């Protein structure tokens, strides 16, 4: 889906055991990067190979739909070098018809000469700076169905075992990993620790209230689960997902009476 949109393609292989490397070599230079449990290190290595004015990053399971491909080509033609970062929609949730139900903006196009650096061993990101522009060419995440991996959780646990401290973003995603693996009591502790951090992003804190509520519900602490949801009201205007979760708890409790 990305053939022809870029002036060069830099592919970094972190140790695939299928035919990824052979297939990728047909489209651009493939650099090997020994896996070291650090996604930022791999991305920073890949970014160091880029030689064009702007660097666009995509994961192996990201695609451009035909309409978004045309939007990206039009955006590319418009770039005059004044933008340092171009934020583009990232579609990650879909309904049964394949229509996007959730998206966020990601730092998708970055000026190469600005030497942006990825941060975070897992769920890595680049902190946007400089002249930031928004576009409408969406990237679609098409993750193949598979069992939920414990890779990310192990990376976090290895970091903690080494005595490293997680920043706010890392603490948030660590709590989510614990929740996904049904380690509910630990998830409660991790979500509470994140919510106590002053520098956590508001959106992450709202989602943490949802995650905390889910963990408490699984532990049978339904009243605490409700209070966890209402804590998000002090952060921002009540979100629909939070209100629906609170209503679901109340409805279930009323039916049980």
What is the meaning of each model-derived region?
Residues 164-165, 199, 237:
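Short coil turns that delineate tetratricopeptide repeat
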Residues 41-47, 58, 64-189:
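Catalytic-site signature of metal-activated, phosphate-bearing donor transferases
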Residues 1, 13-22, 35, 59-62:
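A conserved acidic beta->alpha catalytic loop
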Residues 169, 203-207, 241:
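Start-of-helix register in tetratricopeptide repeats
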Residues 22-45, 49:
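Conserved donor nucleotide-binding strand/loop of the catalytic core
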Residues 55:
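Short aromatic/hydrophobic "clamp" motif used to bind/position activated sugar donors
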């Amino acid at each position: 889906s990305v053939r022809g949109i870029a002036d060069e393609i830099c592919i970094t292989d972190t140790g695939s055991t299928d035919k990824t490397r052979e297939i990728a070599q047909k489209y651009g230079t493939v650099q090997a990067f020994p896996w070291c449990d650090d996604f930022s290190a791999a991305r920073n290595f890949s970014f160091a190979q880029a030689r064009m004015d702007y660097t666009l990053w995509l994961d192996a399971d990201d695609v451009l739909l035909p309409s978004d491909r045309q939007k990206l080509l039009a955006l590319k033609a418009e770039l005059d070098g004044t933008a340092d970062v171009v934020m583009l929609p990232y579609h990650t949730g879909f309904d049964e018809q394949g229509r996007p139900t959730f998206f966020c903006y990601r730092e998708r196009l970055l000026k190469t000469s600005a030497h942006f650096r990825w941060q975070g061993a897992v769920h890595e990101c680049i902190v946007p700076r400089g002249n930031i522009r928004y576009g409408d060419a969406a990237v679609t995440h098409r993750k193949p169905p598979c069992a939920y991996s414990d890779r990310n959780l192990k990376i976090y646990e290895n970091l903690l075992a080494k005595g490293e401290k997680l920043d706010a973003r890392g603490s948030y995603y660590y709590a989510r990993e614990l929740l996904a693996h049904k380690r509910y009591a630990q998830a409660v502790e991790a979500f509470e620790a994140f919510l106590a951090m002053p520098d956590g992003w508001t959106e992450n804190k709202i989602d943490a209230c949802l995650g905390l509520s889910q963990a408490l519900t699984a532990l049978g602490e339904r009243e605490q689960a409700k209070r966890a949801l209402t804590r998000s009201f002090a952060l921002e205007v009540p979100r629909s997902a939070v209100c629906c979760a609170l209503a679901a708890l109340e409805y279930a409790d009323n039916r049980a009476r």
